[in-house]
Amino acid sequence: MALKCGIVGLPNVGKSTLFNCLSSAKAQAANFPFCTIEPNVGVITVPDERLTKLAELVHPGRIVPATCEIVDIAGLVKGASKGEGRGNKFLGNIRETDAIIHVLRCFEDENITHVDGTIDPVRDKEIIDTELQLKDLETIESRLQKQQKIAAIGNNKDAKIEVAVLEAYKAVLEQGKNARTVEFDSKEEQDAARNLFLLTAKPVLYVCNVDEASAKSGNEFTRKIEELAKEEGAETMVIAAKTEEDIAELESYEDKQMFLEELGLEESGVNRLIKKAYSLLNLETFITAGEMEVKAWTYHKGWKAPQCAGVIHTDFEKGFIRAEVIKYDDYIQLGSEAAVREAGKLGIEGKDYVVQDGDIMHFRFNV
């Protein structure tokens, strides 16, 4: 299950610099709009210290972490919803992602131009939000006309549910709010909402790009964004992308840690961002551990054992019999699977077991 996040923002806010930090691919970080014309795509690993600690005990042939696909989407501009700049193409690229990483410029630097001439991340956020909202309204109005006719002609229950969902979204978007602020109670409404694939319904992480001096505590710009994000239930984080790029170029782990300590940081902003993006979509990890490999597998929080078995192979889900489960802490404390069995800590779970983050799983199946 590959997580796909799109990095968006106005030109020259630090998107490509951030992408360079996240991925080994080098996007062209140029000081002019549209330097990212085709979306740059990079596959990055999700940091997970548990895999390394397990590998020290299991001695596998390899370690396979979970991965996340990052797409650097070219700079949006005012009017993108009407095709300004490269608007239609950019908005289409956003639609293909699972979550949005919205980069906002929260630093002063007279050597880096801003398309509107001044630094105002609140205004920048509103520009991008407005373009996405206008595109969503266009989608809704087109769909609403069609579904209203279907609901009226045949007394179609599904069409009526979708009409109610569309009208709820329309009312919110017309107020300049994002679709993600709307909550639906029934499963039917939730399913109808999910199938619309609205841009502003996607989970979003607002990344406040700051200078090195503000890397630890943020600044007045970031605090304004935090207040706005709280109102719509969105996540925020502070990162100094240029500094992170410098850290990424250091050779040794020790040098990187020393640099972070000098800034008063325990973990790199890149690692924090990847973890936040992972949790943004309500994703967790279970682990398989053996002589061949220690591997992280991604699943949706709340999934039961058969569904997680299906992540490895569809046959595992179809022929699921049971799951043998070891808690990560037990494995680390006792040192081996044999010791866990001997201590009576190996769980035998059936089809109703809800898998927990960090569970070490072995599935029994028959096809």
Region roles according to the model:
Residues 1-113, 122, 141, 147:
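Conserved G1/Walker A P-loop phosphate-binding module
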Residues 24-25, 50-51, 75-77, 105-111, ...:
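Conserved nucleotide-binding/hydrolysis micro-motifs of P-loop NTPases
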Residues 30-31, 112-116, 218-220, 250:
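Short amphipathic alpha-helical segments
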Residues 76-83, 117-132, 151-157, 213, ...:
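Flexible beta-alpha connector loops of hexameric P-loop NTPases
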Residues 88-89, 95, 99-102, 107-135, ...:
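Switch/coupling subdomain of P-loop NTPase systems
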Residues 96, 356-357:
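Short, flexible surface segments
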